[in-house]
Design a protein with these regions (language model features):
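Conserved segment of the helicase C-terminal RecA-like domain
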Residues: 6-53
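Compact mixed alphabeta submodule
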Residues: 389-443
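Short, surface-exposed beta-strand/loop "edge" segments at domain boundaries and coil↔beta transitions
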Residues: 113-117, 188-197, 332-345, 390-394, ...
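Long, largely alpha-helical accessory region at the distal end of helicase-like NTP-driven motors
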Residues: 49-185, 198
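Acidic, glycine-rich low-complexity segments with interspersed aromatic residues
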Residues: 161, 166-168, 287-395
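Charge-dense, extended regions
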Residues: 205-334
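Long amphipathic alpha-helical coiled-coil/heptad-repeat bundle
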Residues: 168-175, 179-223
């Protein structure tokens, strides 16, 4: 089957493809050759072929990269290099948090159901990832999206109620850890002794032991004392617990609105289901899952830092004394790595060459700490992303813990003005082959 067509709709493309697959009974296979048109929207091709309508850029890039590895059954797919390049460029340009994409996906699901979808419906019917709605700066919550775009939605909340919904939506609804979601649920259900009840519920229902290191960061998030910098003011009034670790009187008053309470609980259940689906298989004694994706803020939170760190202050890596942890963030750029030896780069799937921040000495506390981690028990965690210019998916793959090997040495940086210390890390877990290939390849 040869297809020559513009790329306008993932759904129409699949329907066209389905017609071509009606092979005769005597034929064992069919080959489809697709000549891609309309380069602006050819990101719809991996969406159509993968059936992944979440509009997650990195997931689409990986599908184009890995193709047949991710296809179910006996089907195979191959993209030539020019097609890969064009599709990657289209994915990079696309704005998947765009209101039109969100509205079109919402309307398609609404027409399918014959009613306003609830949060769980988006996952149940493989529609757009609701996180795209939460991450859209115009909305921030499903309630606000419906208020602006659904004429049949008549529910009104106060600005403060909306802030609570937006805070949970943006910070916890992805389900990357159960603790905060469960704590907020307990604030609604019991209103007293929240942390004590949280410890009991975690152990009894999830077999998770509440660690002492969890205590401060979770309380700080519930009291709006975790955020720093300009972000601190955004949700400063959405307070969940008071100084006695009971539900804050302000929230108790707002919960008198039964519809608000219902939406809070629905949002929390959505996050808990995401957690159960994606994040229960934590690595070693951490709250992180190998090969899952995390933002800078996610990492600070899940490593149990007392307060968040502004990304600009992290600068590639940052040490937290209270938890004795140091996350290392690598932006892997194939073209840049081809051009300069003084850039972070992989030697193989378990070995990484890294550089310190400028003008450090080998004798500095920072470098000595890294090389003495066997004695000081420093935990060094690696996070890698492929394209730092992606404004939608600002997330890194978690690759596990690593250890410094060989001797560090001083190098002069390409600008000839600054020096740095070069050192080598060995990962505890070799990076999964298909993920490693995806990260290091150009297309």
């Amino acid at each position: 089957v040869i297809m020559l067509r513009p790329t306008q709709s993932a759904i129409v493309f699949v329907q066209q493809l389905g017609r071509g697959l009606r092979k005769s009974p005597s034929k064992e296979y069919v080959v489809i050759i697709d000549f891609i048109g309309n380069y602006e929207k050819n990101f719809l091709i991996p969406i159509a072929l993968s059936g992944n309508y979440t509009y997650n850029k990195d997931a689409l890039r990986r599908f184009v990269s890995e193709g047949s590895l991710l296809m179910p059954g006996a089907s195979t797919i191959n993209f030539d290099l020019v097609s890969k390049k064009k599709i990657y460029e289209s994915i990079d340009r696309a704005k998947f948090n765009d209101t039109k994409i969100i509205k079109d996906s919402y309307l398609h699901l609404k027409h399918k159901l014959g009613r306003i979808p609830n949060l769980a419906d988006f996952d149940l019917y493989d529609s757009i990832d609701v996180l795209r709605i939460f991450q859209n700066k115009t909305f921030g919550s499903y309630h606000k999206f419906l208020t602006k775009n659904e004429k049949d939605y008549k529910i009104k909340f106060t600005p403060l109620q909306e802030k609570y919904l937006e805070y949970i939506s943006s910070k916890f609804a992805a389900g990357k850890r159960i603790h905060e979601l469960l704590a907020i649920k307990l604030c609604i259900e019991y209103q007293e002794n929240i942390i004590t009840r949280l410890k009991e519920r975690l152990l009894n229902e999830y077999k998770i032991k509440f660690k002492e290191v969890n205590y401060l960061p979770i309380i700080n998030q519930l009291k709006q004392e975790f955020a720093t910098g300009g972000a601190k003011a955004t949700f400063q009034d959405a307070i969940f617990i008071d100084d006695n670790l009971n539900t804050h009187h302000q929230l108790i008053e707002l919960l008198q609105d039964s519809i608000f309470k219902k939406q809070l609980l629905e949002l929390i259940e959505f996050g808990i289901n995401r957690y159960k689906t994606n994040y229960t298989n934590t690595h070693k004694d951490t709250d992180l899952c190998l090969y899952q994706k995390y933002t800078y803020e996610d990492v600070c939170r899940l490593l149990n830092w007392e307060v968040n760190a502004v990304p600009l202050n992290i600068g590639g890596y940052k040490y937290d004394q209270r938890t004795n942890t140091m996350p290392v963030f690598i932006n892997h750029d194939h073209d840049a790595n081809q051009g300069g030896k003084y850039l972070h780069r992989f030697v193989d799937a378990s070995t990484l060459i890294c550089f310190s921040k400028p003008n450090r000495s080998i004798d500095s506390d920072e470098i000595q700490r890294i090389y003495d981690e066997a004695n000081n028990h420093l935990q060094i965690h690696l996070f890698v992303r492929k394209n730092k210019n992606d404004t939608t998916s600002k997330e890194f793959y978690y690759m596990g813990q690593m250890h410094a090997i060989n001797e560090p040495f001083k190098v002069q940086l390409p600008d000839n003005k600054n020096s740095a210390i070069q050192f080598t890390y060995r990962l505890e877990n070799e990076i999964r082959k298909e993920l490693f290939d995806y990260i290091i390849q150009k297309y």
